[in-house]
């Protein structure tokens, strides 16, 4: 799969047309209709041009993923996912908005690097009855520093956390209503932290 590389460049660096697609593989084990464990991996080669060295280079990224969902009781279900890798920002929710698949290397002029990053979430869903359920989820996305990054912008994003609680009611086969509360935190490399709250409501009619 050819995927657009999200990057942070400068006047000395630019992203080329990619020479190779991203290669992904996965395997899944199911032990009933609503429970499974899935493992996945991805490798990607990202090509860029250096005006300093007047040549093209490639940086290799990789990612590992594990996810699961399973019943604890007849009404209670657990779910979660864990991702770790380098240069996979475009595949991770919060990080996909930051253009950090590949970034300039402050310690090597005219070169770019892939940074370690992770993202995970875990949650529970409780089915009050066949038409009503409530759920809660916690998630974390984190970008790690290497080779002095981000020396020019310490206010850059380092970590984001979300806590979500919601409830949904399938009023009929056509009508669903729901409400959700979300609290989010952002921490920068400078350790500055901000937070926000959001309340969402949903009415959906299918026909």
Task: Please report, for each region that a protein language model flagged, where it lies by residue.
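Short, small-residue-biased leader/transition segments that mark boundaries at the very start
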Residues: 1-6
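Outer-membrane beta-barrel "beta-signal"
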Residues: 70, 169-171, 195-207
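Residues that define the transmembrane beta-barrel architecture of outer-membrane proteins
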Residues: 19-23, 58-64, 114-118, 158-163, ...
């Amino acid at each position: 799969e050819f995927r657009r590389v999200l990057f942070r460049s400068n006047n000395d660096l630019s992203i080329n047309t990619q020479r190779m697609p991203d290669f992904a593989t996965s395997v899944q084990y199911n032990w009933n209709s609503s429970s499974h464990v899935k493992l996945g991996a991805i490798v990607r080669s990202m090509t860029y041009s250096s005006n300093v060295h007047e040549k093209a280079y490639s940086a290799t990224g990789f990612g590992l993923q594990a996810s699961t969902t399973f019943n604890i009781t007849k009404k209670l279900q657990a779910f979660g996912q864990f991702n770790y890798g380098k240069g996979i920002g475009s595949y991770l929710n919060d990080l996909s908005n930051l253009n950090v698949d590949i970034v300039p290397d402050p310690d090597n002029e005219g070169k770019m690097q892939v940074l370690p990053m992770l993202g995970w979430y875990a949650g529970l869903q409780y089915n009050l009855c066949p038409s009503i359920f409530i759920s809660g989820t916690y998630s974390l996305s984190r970008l790690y520093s290497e080779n002095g990054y981000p020396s020019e912008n310490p206010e850059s994003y380092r970590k984001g956390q979300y806590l979500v609680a919601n409830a949904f009611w399938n009023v009929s086969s056509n009508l669903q209503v729901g409400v959700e509360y979300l609290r989010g935190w952002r921490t920068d490399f400078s350790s500055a932290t901000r937070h926000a709250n959001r309340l969402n409501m949903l009415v959906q009619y299918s026909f």
